[in-house]
């Protein structure tokens, strides 16, 4: 296989001369011009372009290697000039060994050179070959200044600058000097107003003048002095100067609250012996009284025991502190009272029994008042019973 390449290289010219053969293969897809005379001299020296039979017989075992190029050789041979190319529409030059092809190719270049200047020249006119196609549709020449349109002419014609609105005299006056209210002398206000004569007024004075028709008073009205702090006032009856409320008698004289109420209720002047140095005030009870608050028991007062529940569990709670020896003795009594400090504290006299509840409460025996109080406080229902 490699001997065939060696033979072709030895029979042909220098490797540089054989290189156009590579260009010949790419001639259908390459725009490079290759002289046909040189290609004609190289083609006979390449055995694989002459067919499979042109190979030497001594290399028959290797002939099948060149069978595929030999079969495709006609497409690259003399008839390969008609092979189309996807890159350029024109076909390659036929391998003709004469000077006519060069002259024909040169004529083609000359024809392309006359259309080479496709961009429009500066003067705006087209060359002669395009006159018959472009002339009827477009004008003979483009405008000399393509960027001069109506907008540019309008901008160039407006030479005078745009007038800027000058600040008003009032704005300059506000910036140069501060205003002052002619009524109160204030220099700071959220809104400046004017009076009937054109003088500046602050917002407060302007609103007051607009609503009332008068100038706003500069001195604020003093608050009413409390009656207890009024200087120079004294009761016409008891001559006191301290009171919670000043009243007037029938003659119109100021009197203290105590003398005025006494005169109003009794119709006579209040006696001087009833005068007090301090002011007696009534202790008012709070409006919200906790009615469910239990009152603490006292040893000198009897605490009535009124059960609020008739369940059997409450009867068991009340009798848990009773002694078993005194329960039969208390069963025959119809009512019971709590013994005082001067009475006997014997177990018989301290027996406690609920009236009307003979079937439920058989008897409760407590030794002392302290035990009664302790027993009452331990039960959850006794707090409501004592309320």
Swiss-Prot record:
Residue numbers spanned by region Disordered: 54-82, 276-355
Ranges annotated as biased composition (Low complexity): 299-316, 329-350
Keywords: Activator, DNA-binding, Metal-binding, Nucleus, Repeat, Transcription, Transcription regulation, Zinc, Zinc-finger
Localisation per UniProt entry: Nucleus
Tissue expression: More abundant in stomach, and in small intestine. Lower levels in lung, liver, ovary and heart.
Extent of Basic residues compositional bias: 281-290
Segments forming GATA-type zinc fingers: 181-205, 235-259
Domain of life: Eukaryota
A GO CC term assigned to this protein in UniProt: nucleus
Keyword set includes Zinc-finger: yes
GO biological process terms, semicolon-separated: cell fate commitment; epithelial cell differentiation; negative regulation of transcription by RNA polymerase II; positive regulation of DNA-templated transcription; positive regulation of transcription by RNA polymerase II
Function: Transcriptional activator.
Name of this chain's protein: Transcription factor GATA-6
Gene designation per UniProt: GATA6
């Amino acid at each position: 296989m490699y001997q065939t390449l060696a033979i072709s290289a030895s029979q042909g010219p220098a490797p540089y001369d054989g290189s156009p053969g590579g260009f010949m293969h790419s001639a259908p897809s390459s725009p490079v011009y290759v002289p046909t005379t040189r290609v004609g001299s190289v083609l006979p020296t390449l055995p694989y372009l002459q067919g499979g039979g042109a190979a030497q017989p001594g290399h028959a075992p290797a002939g099948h290697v060149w069978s595929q190029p030999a079969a495709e050789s006609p497409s690259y041979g003399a008839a390969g000039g008609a092979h189309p190319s996807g890159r350029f529409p024109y076909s390659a030059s036929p391998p003709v060994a004469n000077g006519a092809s060069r002259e024909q190719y040169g004529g083609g270049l000359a024809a392309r050179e006359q259309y080479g200047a496709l961009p429009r020249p500066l003067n705006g006119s087209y060359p002669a070959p395009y006159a018959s196609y472009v002339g009827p549709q477009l004008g003979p020449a483009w405008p000399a200044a393509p960027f001069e349109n109506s907008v540019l002419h309008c901008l160039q014609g407006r030479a005078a600058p745009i007038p800027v609105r000058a600040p008003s005299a009032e704005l300059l006056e506000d910036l140069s000097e501060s205003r002052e209210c002619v009524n109160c002398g204030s220099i700071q206000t959220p809104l400046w107003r004017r009076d009937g004569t054109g003088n500046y007024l602050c917002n407060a004075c302007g609103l007051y003048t607009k609503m009332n028709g008068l100038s706003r008073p500069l001195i604020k009205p003093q608050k009413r002095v409390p009656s207890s702090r009024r200087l120079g006032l004294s009761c016409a009856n008891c001559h006191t100067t301290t009171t919670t409320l000043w009243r007037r008698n029938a003659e119109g004289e100021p009197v203290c609250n105590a003398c005025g109420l006494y005169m109003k209720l009794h119709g006579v002047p209040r006696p001087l012996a009833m005068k007090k140095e301090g002011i007696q005030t009534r202790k008012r009870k709070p409006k919200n009284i906790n009615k469910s608050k239990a009152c603490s028991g006292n040893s000198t007062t009897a605490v009535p025991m009124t059960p609020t529940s008739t369940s059997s569990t409450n009867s068991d709670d009340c009798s848990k502190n009773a002694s078993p020896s005194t329960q039969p003795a208390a069963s025959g009594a119809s009512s019971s009272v709590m013994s005082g400090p001067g009475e006997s504290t014997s177990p018989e006299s301290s027996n406690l029994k609920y009236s009307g509840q003979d079937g439920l409460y058989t008897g409760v025996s407590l030794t002392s008042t302290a035990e009664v109080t302790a027993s009452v406080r331990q039960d959850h229902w006794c707090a409501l019973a004592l309320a």
